[in-house]
Design a protein with these regions (language model features):
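ASCE RecA-like P-loop NTPase motor cores
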Residues: 1-244
Length: 244
């Protein structure tokens, strides 16, 4: 009783699908993975609820997820254009008006964003390269509801389109399939640093290695329910079926 509970869902799409995980599932996963990293860095007790599907799914190394987290507070010197680029490579979607998790909008020196793990959106007010204030606002009404002294910004996708990951993807893709054709939309989009529907299913091509939940939390006691082994076997069979 009283222990924090972290929920790690699986992607809400089929294995090797041509669509990306939904924004809500992606946000909840990144929120949980970031919290799991914090459990190791600042040890404390917690309960992690997950599924057979999520348990079988490989994930980016914890060090890379942690490196994507951005911390800021009023008074910091921040290149707004660099922050916008960071949001785009981390999986955020640029929109005219922020309404949901995973979105950001820019109007002059104001940057609105709604990140994983947040209950409300934030409005960053810049004067030049100085972050003057962090205001909380209601995404439905766009009205300010409070102030923040700091923020921690997580990634929105398990695929960060950095020069390193793009280069690794291109190399891995060519090694696996040879020279891409001109109409290969996936290869072209990633090469240009653009996100492409379903690219998360190519996760091993973006990173040197992947990890599991057990790599994030070594020596952690695991409790299975009575149908867990059957669920794991069914998921494994589904993965093989879609692969073939």
């Amino acid at each position: 009783p009283g222990l924090p509970v972290l929920e790690l869902p699986a992607w809400d799409c089929l294995p090797y699908d041509r669509v990306s995980p939904g924004a809500d599932a992606a946000a909840r996963r990144l929120d949980a993975l970031t919290a799991m990293i914090a459990l190791v860095k600042r040890p404390h007790r917690a309960v992690i609820l997950t599924t057979a599907n999520a348990l079988l799914q490989r994930i980016p190394p914890a060090s890379l997820i942690e490196a994507q987290t951005f911390h800021a507070r009023p008074g910091n010197q921040i290149d707004m254009n660099a922050l916008v680029s960071r949001l785009e490579t981390s999986g955020f979607e640029r929109v005219p008006t922020v309404r949901g998790v995973g979105e950001f909008a820019v109007r002059g020196g104001i940057l609105d964003l709604f990140a994983p793990g947040w209950t409300e959106a934030l409005r960053l007010d810049f004067f030049g390269d100085t972050l003057e204030s962090i205001r909380v606002f209601d995404a439905a009404t766009q009205r300010t509801t409070g102030q923040r002294k700091s923020m921690a910004l997580q990634a929105m996708s398990e695929v960060a389109l950095t020069p390193e990951t793009i280069s690794r993807f291109r190399r891995s893709y060519i090694e696996a399939f040879g020279a891409p054709s001109r109409d290969d939309g996936l290869y072209a989009a990633v090469s240009e640093g653009r996100r492409f529907a379903g690219m998360e299913h190519w996760l091993p091509f973006f990173y040197e290695r992947l990890e599991t939940v057990f790599d994030y939390l070594p020596d952690t006691p695991v409790v299975f329910d009575h149908l867990a082994h059957e669920a794991l076997a069914e998921r494994h069979a589904l993965i093989l079926d879609h692969y073939e």
